[in-house]
Amino acid sequence: MKTALVFAAVVAFVAARFPDHKDYKQLADKQFLAKQRDVLRLFHRVHQHNILNDQVEVGIPMTSKQTSATTVPPSGEAVHGVLQEGHARPRGEPFSVNYEKHREQAIMLYDLLYFANDYDTFYKTACWARDRVNEGMFMYSFSIAVFHRDDMQGVMLPPPYEVYPYLFVDHDVIHMAQKYWMKNAGSGEHHSHVIPVNFTLRTQDHLLAYFTSDVNLNAFNTYYRYYYPSWYNTTLYGHNIDRRGEQFYYTYKQIYARYFLERLSNDLPDVYPFYYSKPVKSAYNPNLRYHNGEEMPVRPSNMYVTNFDLYYIADIKNYEKRVEDAIDFGYAFDEHMKPHSLYHDVHGMEYLADMIEGNMDSPNFYFYGSIYHMYHSMIGHIVDPYHKMGLAPSLEHPETVLRDPVFYQLWKRVDHLFQKYKNRLPRYTHDELAFEGVKVENVDVGKLYTYFEQYDMSLDMAVYVNNVDQISNVDVQLAVRLNHKPFTYNIEVSSDKAQDVYVAVFLGPKYDYLGREYDLNDRRHYFVEMDRFPYHVGAGKTVIERNSHDSNIIAPERDSYRTFYKKVQEAYEGKSQYYVDKGHNYCGYPENLLIPKGKKGGQAYTFYVIVTPYVKQDEHDFEPYNYKAFSYCGVGSERKYPDNKPLGYPFDRKIYSNDFYTPNMYFKDVIIFHKKYDEVGVQGH
């Protein structure tokens, strides 16, 4: 009883120091609800002309006076003129931000929206652009503007896979949904149909289609690129992004590691990195069609890269060599030839990652280029090197890039540069890794089960209607999606005093695909972060109980557009209440993919926990709106990353076993089983 009272007191103290994100839900007022409703309606059937007459009237051709109500450089009127006078990408054509002309126009539109002086100007500009610029460009620029404008904080976007399903759902599924809708056109009724997804096993890569084609995974990457577009100039827009480059590295490093664990569960070896001299063996048919009916390019197997209209292969190799030279010399040079140390400057990792991504914070974009994006363009256009077809391939859309197996081979090459840099950093000493007075006594993990399930998805937006009276609800059940049974784990910590600590949880492989046990230094590259959170431990023993739902890397399942709009509309009409959740993050990793697929007889993994000192970085550290999903998505602008250690610590540097194992960490062998849905006994599904 005494122990229970002490534990309750500790829990109460923790709640006071690190408030639960539920405390940050605020009741939305009518002004906010109007904004939220406006945004949802602007995304309604964006691939066709607006059928909502009030927005059409608001969006009539804007006057010079209206376009001057913006602080966009050089002037709103000039930018508006470029977009309005037929110079922009026309509607009905595919859009890709990786194409320079498309990107320039998208930035112009973003500037018009972002620099609008007030919400009224912002909304009118959006209504104007909704029917007058390319629909893909509108979705892209408008989404990013909603994320970054101060007066839109808390406003949420509808799921991208519902707004524009053509980049998320196989075209045969969309075609069948359109056929079903035609049979019931204009009825206004709800129709749900089960449409099986064809994961035909033509190659090894098809074994992983349940993972790479998961709409939540691809929505996660879409939102990440909306938060941190490579063209985003932090100086111009006045937003500081803490650890921007390092976050880019870590996010894609984690995605790759997660992909690797799925390969293990399917008895597949690791992939080889891309080599210029070897053919690209992985064929890929995206099975996607743009809304205008054009098919996304198909890549045959065993093709060699060639020069293309944007770059010569020699140019890309030169940029790559310059980055390697910077790693070897230890310095990167900016546009004024000022050297920046990669090893003796606290921002060294930032300089390198910004150079490799080629974002606008790069020390010298014109000298170091953007080899990450160049790789994608080089292989993406391997079947159309001179853009004769004019269609963007899967590697040049944030919505589709993770579906293509070559992405992971390209990342393997990119990661080689990062590891070359990391391997020159000094290893962590025993004293650096240890936490004096703190020991993880035990970790107890509940049973881990994965399963495949059918899940509902609305394809309302994939059908064309003439007016609001023709709108019918079209739902499909897509099979299959990987999911897991919720699980708990307990971490038993002893401490010589009461103090704030930081807990990080990882999951990694134990054996390779042939059943050989991994050396820790080899498998450190494949540990995926499961959770990261602050905690207050008392003197003596503390048991930390954690549920998989609590994970700070995940985003909850998104409401469908239809459900979301209904909630907002009813609250606007005073029929219900709507709360703005500051702890919600668009960009979080999908909850259904938190753990990799198991096997019927079980797949062995290693559960790893490390407890480190909590070092305060900012006065708002770990307020829920500041840290939810920050490990994969960063903390946004004008916020400090709530940890002083490198991302991925302590697996980010070489490991020497004799010094690595310390009392404040714990390795636990776990088994993940894969069962049929009806064998798992999941509640609430």
From Swiss-Prot:
Residues 1-16 form the signal peptide. PROSITE patterns: HEMOCYANIN_2. Transmembrane segments: none annotated. It is found in: Secreted, Extracellular space. Glycans are attached at residue 233. Gene3D superfamilies: Di-copper center containing domain from catechol oxidase (1.10.1280.10), Hemocyanin, C-terminal domain (2.60.40.1520), Hemocyanin, N-terminal domain (1.20.1370.10). Its main location: secreted. Keywords: Allergen, Glycoprotein, Secreted, Signal, Storage protein. It comes from the Eukaryota. InterPro entries: Di-copper_centre_dom_sf, Hemocyanin/hexamerin, Hemocyanin/hexamerin_mid_dom, Hemocyanin_C, Hemocyanin_C_sf, Hemocyanin_N, Hemocyanin_N_sf, Ig_E-set. One of its GO terms (molecular function) is nutrient reservoir activity. GO terms for cellular component: extracellular region. Belongs to the hemocyanin family. Larval storage protein (LSP) which may serve as a store of amino acids for synthesis of adult proteins. This is Allergen Cr-PI. It comes from Periplaneta americana (American cockroach).
